Amino acid sequence: LGRLGAEHIMVVHSDDGLDEISIATETHVAEYRDGALSEYKLQPENYFSERQSLEGLAVENATESLALIIDALGKQTNANGAKAAQLIAINAGAALYVAGCAADMHQGVEMALDAIGSGLAKAKINDLATFTQVQQDG
């Protein structure tokens, strides 16, 4: 990917089979930055108080997925919403880090958690939904 012009990327795969950073188990990372490749492992407990089970996060359809995302970005009315918020935050934190908006993963995760807690993340999702609807109707 570096030969294709990428400046900073992370390729991730968790021990539980996710192709994203997991809150349940170790995640293997290959990070390319400034022309150098490094490999390391991320532990979810380095970002949150403890590892979380992925139980309750699998969804059957788009309606269930939307409900879980709304809960995760909102009041987190149940344990699944809180776990989903952590999963969103750790992966959004990685994106913020790779994009250069955060100095490191820890800062990226904190920024993502702040956006979720303040309602900013949910507002941005609502903006995207409105934009998408306007484009479909337009």
Residue ranges with predicted function:
Residues 1-138:
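Glycine-rich anion-binding loops and their surrounding alpha/beta cores
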